[in-house]
Design a protein with these regions (language model features):
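Acidic (Asp/Glu)-rich catalytic clusters
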Residues: 69-76, 92-112, 166-167, 201-209, ...
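Active-site beta->alpha N-cap acidic-glycine motif
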Residues: 37-109, 116-119, 127, 131-156, ...
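Catalytic grooves of carbohydrate-active enzymes
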Residues: 218-293
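Sequence-level motif detector for i,i+2 pairs with an aromatic at +2
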Residues: 50, 107, 209-214, 254-256
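Hydrophobic core
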Residues: 21-25
Length: 320
C-alpha cells in the first residue's frame, strides 16, 4: 500500500520484506526485514545520529503556500499543513484546493483542523462529530489521505468527549504546550506519572499525554507571550529544536520537537512569522543536519502504547 509520495506504508505488527534495486551503486541493494510488533522501537534506535524536527502549519493560510513553501522547497523539507475545511475557497487569505492538492502531491502531509476552527470543548456531541469527522471526509473527498488532527485554539485534548470523537477518525492528534513531545509520554513529570501513551487509565480517566494530545511548540504564541524580536525568537527556536539532545543520548529517540507556525510573511500583527526569520530558521536546520519529518512519519505501537518514528526508508524528506 502506498501514500501520495508513492512510498510503502508500514503498519504495526506487519512483517515487511523490501528489496530496493538501485543502479546508482551508492545505495546498492537494501534488504530490510522489520518487525513492527514488540521491536518497533528499534526503528527509532537506528536514528540516534539524527536530530529530528516536525514542522506544522495551522489554518491553511495562503501565505504558507506563497511564502513558506518556496523556502521549504529550497531545502527539500516537507511539513504537515492543517486545513480548516470551510475556510478553503470561502475566506480570503486561505489556500484553495489546487494549492492544497499541490502541497499533497509534492509529498507534504495534510491534516484536519476541523470544519470551522471551532472551540470543540464548548460544542455538543453532535457538533463535535461534525467538526471532527466531516472535516476528514471533506479532505478525503478531494483525494487527500488524512491521518492526524490539530485542535483549534489548542482546546479539547483534555476532554473525554472530544477525544472519543477524534479517536474514531484519526491515528494521532496534536495540541501545543511543550518544546518537545515524548514518544513514551513519560516526560511531563510535573503533570503526570504515566510511563506510556495509553489514552485512558484503568479507571477510564483520560490521561494527560497520549497519541491524541501530542504536544508542539507554538512559534507565534512564544513571540506574543514574550514580546520577542526576530533575533530573540531565532534564539528560542534554536533552543527548542535542540532540546531533544537532553533526552536522545545514544539510546532510542525519546523526544521530538514539533514547531507550529500560522501566518507566514503576510504582514499581520499577530500569529505571523517574518519570511526573513523563517529563512534563517530553515537554514539553521539544514546547516546543522536536522532531519525534517511530518506527523504521518510517526507511528503508534498498540501493544506497548508508545509512539515511534517509522523506518527511514519511509520518511518524508531529510532535506540533507
Amino acid at each position: 500500500m502506498t501514500d501520495n509520495r508513492g512510498v510503502k506504508i508500514i503498519r504495526p505488527k506487519a512483517y515487511v520484506v523490501s528489496i530496493l534495486f538501485s543502479f546508482t551503486i551508492i545505495r546498492g541493494i537494501v534488504l530490510s526485514y522489520t518487525n513492527f510488533g514488540p521491536n518497533a522501537e528499534s526503528i527509532s534506535e537506528n536514528m540516534t545520529s539524527q536530530k529530528l524536527v516536525i514542522l506544522n502549519f495551522d489554518d491553511g493560510r495562503e501565505s504558507q503556500f506563497l511564502n513558506a513553501k518556496p523556502v521549504l522547497d529550497k531545502y527539500g523539507f516537507k511539513a504537515t499543513f492543517y486545513i480548516v475545511c470551510n475556510y478553503v475557497e470561502n475566506k480570503p487569505g486561505f489556500m484553495d484546493w489546487k494549492q492544497i492538492r499541490e502541497l499533497y502531491d509534492e509529498g507534504n502531509d495534510i491534516g484536519s483542523h476541523s470544519m470551522n476552527h471551532a472551540h470543540l470543548s464548548k460544542l455538543s456531541k453532535k457538533e463535535i462529530k461534525f467538526e471532527v469527522g466531516e472535516s476528514k471526509k471533506c479532505l478525503e473527498d478531494h483525494g487527500i489521505r488524512v491521518t492526524s488532527f490539530a485542535f483549534p485554539f489548542n482546546e479539547g485534548s483534555n476532554s473525554k468527549e472530544v477525544i472519543n470523537s477524534v479517536s474514531k477518525y484519526y491515528d494521532l492528534a496534536r495540541t501545543a504546550g511543550s518544546p518537545v513531545t515524548y514518544l513514551h509520554c513519560d516526560g511531563w513529570k510535573n503533570q503526570s506519572s504515566q510511563k506510556d501513551c495509553r489514552t485512558f487509565t484503568k479507571n477510564e480517566d483520560l490521561t494527560f499525554a497520549n497519541r491524541y494530545s501530542i504536544r508542539g511548540w507554538s512559534h507565534d504564541m512564544s513571540r506574543i507571550a514574550n514580546a520577542y524580536t526576530d533575533d530573540d525568537l531565532l534564539k528560542r527556536f534554536i533552543n527548542v529544536v535542540n532540546t531533544q539532545t537532553e533526552y536522545n543520548k545514544g539510546e532510542a529517540i525519546k523526544a521530538i520537537p514539533i514547531v507550529i507556525y500560522h501566518r507566514a510573511g503576510d504582514n499581520a500583527p499577530n500569529y505571523n512569522t517574518d519570511i526573513a526569520l523563517f529563512k534563517r530558521e530553515m537554514s539553521y536546520l539544514h546547516d546543522n543536519n536536522f532531519q525534517v519529518i511530518t506527523m504521518r512519519d510517526l507511528g503508534y505501537e498498540q501493544q506497548g502504547d508508545y509512539l515511534y518514528v517509522k523506518s527511514t526508508e519511509d520518511l518524508s524528506a531529510t532535506g540533507g
